[in-house]
């Protein structure tokens, strides 16, 4: 599977247009969400790094690798003891996957990945291009769902996923 389009920081890319994730302030969160909500891994075959696992997850990891994101370090951290607080795998009835990760500062970050119609309702904010959380109104949610996601992506039969996160202090957790 290949990533055909991406919507990040209010910008949409299509086809061969490639957003430079290294220059986007939200790229680390995107990469972490993809890696921590994935069981895919990277192997070396004939001197080349190759992503292995679920085809959707492999497509997303290949996109990150093509965007020069250091996925191996994230995958390594994913495998360390104590990183995960809990994980609920994706299934067809829930239409989402949830992973709670203990951060190095002691806080917990919960990542969601799944069908946009199941994730968007859980969101209260979005990140702007500078990485700042700004409120996400019901009107903006509808616009994202009906214009950005449905018209641009789902109407082209793209498998469409949304990622989100929420941070908790240790006391809140």
Show where each model-derived region lies:
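Conserved cytosolic headpiece of P-type ATPases
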Residues: 1-173
